[in-house]
Amino acid sequence: MKIQKVWLIAVALGILVGSGGCQRKPEKTRIAMVVKNLGNGFFNAAHIGADEAAKQLGNVEVIYTGPTTPSAEGQIEIINSLISQKVDAIVISANDPNALVPIAKKAMLRGIKVVSFDSGIAPEGRQMQLNPSNAELIGEKQIQMAADAIGGAGEIAILSASAQATNQNIWIGVMKTLLEKPEYAKIKLVATVYGDDQSDKSYREAIGLLRSHPELKAIIAPTTVGIVAASKAVADEHLVGKVYVTGLGLPSEMAGHVKSGAVKEFAIWNPIDLGYAATYAAGQFITGRAEAKPGATVSLGRLGTVTLDANREAALGAPYTYNANNVDKFAKLF
């Protein structure tokens, strides 16, 4: 009799526990987006795309974070915290491709998927790298815009982000190679400086270029922070119409500079799409629908699919050109 009572109590408890479990909502999948630095308009737009992907994936929470100033040390500290929080994936634009490898490996060993986008982590530190575009196309576009602005002849300079930024260094390498071609023989690259993607430092570096090179005709800034700073510097030095700025910028931040004449045209991919695609890809790795191996196909939701190359990298597409004819339209979007 005693045994029967114990058995009945156990069954009753099992029913209660079971019914409680049925009512419990499944835990949300957490994808952390770690950007180069907070307060950067490009990454704010990428965050919008990440949230869109989260809604489509379903039951996904996006944790948007990054250091206040762009540094590998700041990102390492953040990733350590995310590992402790046991997030499901980290989507990151890296401030240094190699310095982040050990902490990224630690995350992957804990079962966290790592997808780098925009500026990549070295292959051993992530499942996938999503490039916004093809490096050759990006470099070529910026040289072409600068050449058109100055009539194919004159001195130009480059204002980049940090000296360790993977993407900018690759693009600059492409630009330097292109400048060796006969069609650009009359264009001379006189300096490459770094503003570390900080507005004040980028502005100071741009002022330095303008004052050190009185014959300068154009500044190429392959960074959304740098192009704004350089445009302001040209205006403040009363050089609009004498020195032109081009590079990669956000329409919402560049519309005024296009209207002022400091910028004839600039280019950028859609950061909303980039953030969306990177987050959607992370979701595929979390659920096992994508494999981190060369030749694997990864779904990017509304943007279709991409195939990973030998380094497990893929690209979205060519950058788009913005000028006085279309900048206002796109400024309303990002």
What are these regions (language model features)?
Residues 56-68, 155-158, 180-197:
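Short beta-strand elements in bilobed, periplasmic/extracellular small-molecule ligand-binding domains
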Residues 163-167, 178-180, 281-334:
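Hinge/cleft segment of the Venus flytrap/periplasmic-binding protein
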Residues 98-137, 145-148, 155, 161, ...:
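Flexible loop/hinge segments that line or gate small-molecule binding clefts
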Residues 30-53, 57, 62-79, 85-87, ...:
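Extracytoplasmic "Venus flytrap"
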Residues 75, 130-156, 201-203, 250-254, ...:
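Hydrophobic alpha-helical segments within soluble ligand-binding/sensing domains
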